[in-house]
Amino acid sequence: MTERPTPTIARIWRGRVQRERADEYAAYLYEHGIKPLEEKALAVQQLREDRDTDSEFVTISYWENIEAMSRFAGKDPRRIHHLARDEEFLIELPKGVQILRITASKGLFGA
């Protein structure tokens, strides 16, 4: 049995939509943003926080290393490739993503 690689990198994207469009965007984001990541990343999470007037979405993808992430995201992995309808949904188009090195993990990936 081949052991699955352990992620060392988390790539975090954030975007906000008007609260009344959050359910529609959640479905769109899953279909067009999360599903492609499922095929390439070691794991991916879609998170949502509903507030009074807006909803924030956070997508976290987990990667074995920067090279693996760059094969998916391109030469500059901080650069965002906006989805076709992001401009329609998002209050403001994010300018970049956050890339963090995983220094400890328990449960999902850790021992």
Task: Name these PLM-found stretches.
Residues L100-A111:
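Acidic/histidine-enriched, glycine/proline-rich intrinsically disordered or flexible terminal extensions
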Residues R4, E31-A43, Y62-I99:
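An amphipathic, aromatic/His-enriched active-site/gating alpha helix that lines ligand/cofactor pockets
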Residues T8-R11, A22:
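Short acidic/polar alpha-helix capping motifs at helix-coil junctions
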Residues R21-D23, E67-M69, S105:
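Residue-level signal for secondary-structure boundary sites
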Residues R16-A27:
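Short, surface-exposed ligand-recognition loops at beta-strand->loop->(often short) alpha-helix junctions
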Residues A10-R16, Q45-P77:
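Short, well-ordered beta-strand segments in beta-rich or mixed alpha/beta enzyme
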Residues P5-P7, R51-T53, I91:
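A generic structural micro-feature
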Residues M1-T6, G110-A111:
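Basic/polar N-terminal segments that are highly enriched at the extreme N-terminus
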